[in-house]
Amino acid sequence: MSGGAGIPDVPAFDASDVRLAIVASTWHTKICDALLAGARNTAADSGIDNPTVVRVLGAIEIPVVAQELTRNHDAVVALGVVIRGETPHFDYVCDAVTQGLTRVSLDSSTPVANGVLTTNSEEQALNRAGLPTSDEDKGAQATAAALTTALTLRELRAEA
């Protein structure tokens, strides 16, 4: 995965023995489907052809499903999009999802990568969704983060 402005270059790595799960919401379908495609591509490039994929309605449902997935997976990727509207709902959802995913990761000692886009506009989300016209692919980036963290944790635990 090639880096752009501030985005690290992630070298190719073999994660073929990592049990990967992806939970993706369905609001803003075009964006979420693109994030999921990027995640699947990165998984395949890393040797994982069939990650577990679970779809949920909205972003707020992602943490509890991620929590369940940590029970039998080595890494979880959370994908979705929350676009700012005219009410404080955006702030509540973004905070709840971010805190929920962080708590799940720490409580389970399992990497849970946060690929939930929190943007001010649909245009910003589309630009990060991994579409042909996008500048970034947050689905791919989150998957690389989850997998490399799982491999790092495996190494650290083997040394202990």
Swiss-Prot record:
Residues noted as binding (2S)-2-hydroxy-3-oxobutyl phosphate in the record, renumbered to the chain: 86-87, 128
Family matches, as CDD domains: Lumazine_synthase-I
Positions annotated to bind 5-amino-6-(D-ribitylamino)uracil: 27, 59-61, 81-83, 114
GO molecular function: 6,7-dimethyl-8-ribityllumazine synthase activity
GO cellular component terms attached to this protein's record: cytosol; riboflavin synthase complex
Location of the active site: 89 (proton donor)
Example GO BP: riboflavin biosynthetic process
Reactions catalysed according to its record: (2S)-2-hydroxy-3-oxobutyl phosphate + 5-amino-6-(D-ribitylamino)uracil = 6,7-dimethyl-8-(1-D-ribityl)lumazine + phosphate + 2 H2O + H(+)
EC number: 2.5.1.78
Keyword Amino-acid biosynthesis (UniProt): no
Keywords: Riboflavin biosynthesis, Transferase
Top enzyme class: transferase
Top-level taxon of origin: Bacteria
Pathway field: Cofactor biosynthesis; riboflavin biosynthesis; riboflavin from 2-hydroxy-3-oxobutyl phosphate and 5-amino-6-(D-ribitylamino)uracil: step 1/2
Annotated Pfam families: DMRL_synthase
Record's function text: Catalyzes the formation of 6,7-dimethyl-8-ribityllumazine by condensation of 5-amino-6-(D-ribitylamino)uracil with 3,4-dihydroxy-2-butanone 4-phosphate. This is the penultimate step in the biosynthesis of riboflavin.
Quaternary assembly: Homopentamer.
PANTHER family: 6,7-DIMETHYL-8-RIBITYLLUMAZINE SYNTHASE (PTHR21058:SF0), 6,7-DIMETHYL-8-RIBITYLLUMAZINE SYNTHASE DMRL SYNTHASE LUMAZINE SYNTHASE (PTHR21058)
Family statement: Belongs to the DMRL synthase family.
Alphabetized NCBIfam families for the sequence: lumazine-synth
Protein name per Swiss-Prot or TrEMBL: 6,7-dimethyl-8-ribityllumazine synthase
Gene: ribH
